[in-house]
């Protein structure tokens, strides 16, 4: 199934200031406007609702009501990918997907389970405690506070041909499907 690629220029202009200031509003958009994408410096940032995400290499952001211990930010080699506010949920859990095409694949996650500051993926919250869990290719986030977040990735420099990037974003070409 082909995905609809939305160019960054099609996003609402008022969001550009929020993004430059480090915030990324997810809750203001109706479902029909997902997936959403924006170029951020040399990154292409895509936001999916959880039930829309299909490709590998995606980050899962999930807010839950549990109160885990805090996590400190990484020292030195972390790369700040994005910052934003997760949408609120009366049921205590919401999902959004962040998808970054700058590096593929992600550094291999060492194991499933909860992270600590020695792991390659660490989550830092602003105004609330949080904990990140690595499961497969997904980073699961728990937050008990305001659920503003920064995701840091220690990435291995790897690249794939443009055709592979397109396949990850769009799925295989019709010719590939018929083979």
UniProtKB/Swiss-Prot annotation:
Region (Disordered): 1-20, 65-86
Bias type Polar residues, positions: 10-20
Name listed for the protein in its UniProt record: B-cell acute lymphoblastic leukemia-expressed protein
Species in which this protein is naturally found: Homo sapiens
